[in-house]
Amino acid sequence: MSSNHPVMDTKSVRHAYRRWAPVYDYTFGQVADAGRKHAVKIINKRKGRVLEVGVGTGLSLPAYGKHLTVTGIDLSPEMLDKAREKVAKKKLGNVDGLHEMDASALGFADESFDTVVAMYVMTVVPDPEKVMRELERVCAPGGEVILVNHFSQEHGARGFFERKLAPFADLIGWHAVFEPERVLICEDLRLAERRPLWPVGLFTMLRFVKEPGFKVAPQAARDFLAKGRKAGSATEPVPS
């Protein structure tokens, strides 16, 4: 990871989400609801095995279609306890397992899942580039990797505020300054769609398709994202 980015370690992440676990559903969980619903709606049109990285308290689990087999992982045991309670209470038989696991070292074989989703995760993990490569690794050819995340702005009031928050990453549990270029590193993942999400474009969905041998030119995807960030446009397919 570049030394230009504030670094959070795994211990800091665990500690932050130990504090968040009791109140997460009623705080950030509400803010993130629109993005979560949008991602799951897309996933429900697909088939097969789904891996949710950073499943947290399991807010998304009841929304997955019963035709899908869902596995969730998270670094926080306290968050996973909340997720397991939801699975038991709602009798979610399509949830195959919930595991305490580091997203940068997934304990699954290559090409194990048809869809891999990480919602509000990449700004939390200590090494997002390593996590991105793990998402690519466990996704099957033709499968999709879906991110919902906050990406920072370089200019304006929001950009100023994000830069002021940057030194407090360990305390708040996430990177306020996070450039989209950090997830555009996998040559076999073609960026197929970008969608700004509520509230007011604070979050963005990126949908990738795994196409081994495609050798995506990262600069093309970066140019597309730069255009979208400037214009604040709605859903757009990314030209391949």
Regions found by a protein language model. Name each.
Residues E129-P141:
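A short glycine-rich, Lys/Arg-flanked "PGG" loop and its adjoining helix->strand segment in the class I
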Residues Q30-G48:
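Conserved alpha-helix/loop element of class I SAM-dependent methyltransferases that forms part
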Residues L51, V55-A105:
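Class I SAM-dependent methyltransferase SAM/SAH-binding core
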Residues T115-D127:
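A short SAM/SAH-binding and catalytic strip from SAM-dependent methyltransferases
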Residues V7, K11, F28-Q30, I146-T204:
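C-terminal alpha-helical "lid/dimerization" subdomain adjacent to the S-adenosyl-L-methionine
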Residues S104-T115:
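A short acidic, Gly/Pro-enriched loop at the edge of an enzyme's catalytic core
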Residues M1-W20:
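N-terminal, positively charged/glycine-rich alpha-helical extensions of SAM-dependent methyltransferases
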Residues D188-L189, E193-G232, E236-S240:
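Core SAM-dependent methyltransferase catalytic element
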